[in-house]
């Protein structure tokens, strides 16, 4: 909105407004808008959540030290979502469909999280939507996202090839184009791509959700991940950088830089209140929304593989749960970790909460920096 006003309409009369044609400038403004919006609205939302007694319910099988956190205002993810959506609408060029798809991913998975949080509040326990029901909703969203990409591909706005780190000349596609030519086998031809995309988005939305178990842990890692995605989105949409780094240039991804910048600023703003000891929790509305948005952006900019490193801690947390559950069922009650997800394992080992958070942040930053260095490697 401000982009159209300040640049499209007024730059002819006020020459300094030409600066708003630069993606970097608008990304900086979007990040700052998201940051200050989140910080400004935080106290009001915390008071309202306390007024309506929307507090966190702690699972009984979790660490005993967490019982003191019961009643802390939750569903703060609503604040994160608002602080991402408004700056994106203000500073992005809304003629690009990628921006709307990223917003849809954030709002869609955020809505699923909202339903889960609402169920927990109304039932007054730590169990919201059933696991199966939540997965069904998530996969519906994932397949809808994949379908939108296929529509854009038909108009030449999206490529289904994948970028493989260290093998930049090797760009496989998950579409079986020979089968897509026949209407009777079209579904089979697009199935591998749709399943892959849905799995990526569902996995990361749940991975962030599983990581959100310590004050500031998940949101701090989101600051790092969103910052790295901001760099990748900018590089992929910049003609000279994309050519230099041998990336598949897509000018449509440049406006995702504004969305990622908003996500970085909003996450940083929420950390202001979520840092230990937390005044508010993001709840599933925040964790599912952020995880889904992160994955959607990675798919749009063709960096699904690098997301394994950018969101490396999220991946480890998710796999710790998968391994723990698998071991318990297949090995007749034997566990690999003292407790899952992984951060609870270190709590059981005697690590303090603040030490776990700081060390996981450091590890997440190292992994994100490694992911960015691979851009230069052939």
UniProtKB/Swiss-Prot annotation:
One GO CC term on file: plasma membrane
Locations listed in the record: Cell inner membrane
InterPro entries (alphabetical): Glycosyl_transferase_4 (IPR000715), PNAcMuramoyl-5peptid_Trfase (IPR003524), PNAcMuramoyl-5peptid_Trfase_CS (IPR018480)
UniProt pathway annotation: Cell wall biogenesis; peptidoglycan biosynthesis
Keywords noted in UniProt: Cell cycle, Cell division, Cell inner membrane, Cell membrane, Cell shape, Cell wall biogenesis/degradation, Magnesium, Membrane, Metal-binding, Peptidoglycan synthesis, Transferase, Transmembrane, Transmembrane helix
Topological relation to the membrane, as annotated: Multi-pass membrane protein
Pfam family, one: Glycos_transf_4
Keyword Magnesium belongs to the record: yes
Main location class: membrane
Catalysed reactions, semicolon-separated: UDP-N-acetyl-alpha-D-muramoyl-L-alanyl-gamma-D-glutamyl-meso-2,6-diaminopimeloyl-D-alanyl-D-alanine + di-trans,octa-cis-undecaprenyl phosphate = di-trans,octa-cis-undecaprenyl diphospho-N-acetyl-alpha-D-muramoyl-L-alanyl-D-glutamyl-meso-2,6-diaminopimeloyl-D-alanyl-D-alanine + UMP
Cofactors (names): Mg(2+)
Leader sequence residues: none
Highest taxon listed in the record's lineage: Bacteria
GO molecular function: metal ion binding; phospho-N-acetylmuramoyl-pentapeptide-transferase activity; UDP-N-acetylmuramoyl-L-alanyl-D-glutamyl-meso-2,6-diaminopimelyl-D-alanyl-D-alanine:undecaprenyl-phosphate transferase activity
Known role: Catalyzes the initial step of the lipid cycle reactions in the biosynthesis of the cell wall peptidoglycan: transfers peptidoglycan precursor phospho-MurNAc-pentapeptide from UDP-MurNAc-pentapeptide onto the lipid carrier undecaprenyl phosphate, yielding undecaprenyl-pyrophosphoryl-MurNAc-pentapeptide, known as lipid I.
Protein name: Phospho-N-acetylmuramoyl-pentapeptide-transferase
Originating organism: Solibacter usitatus (strain Ellin6076)
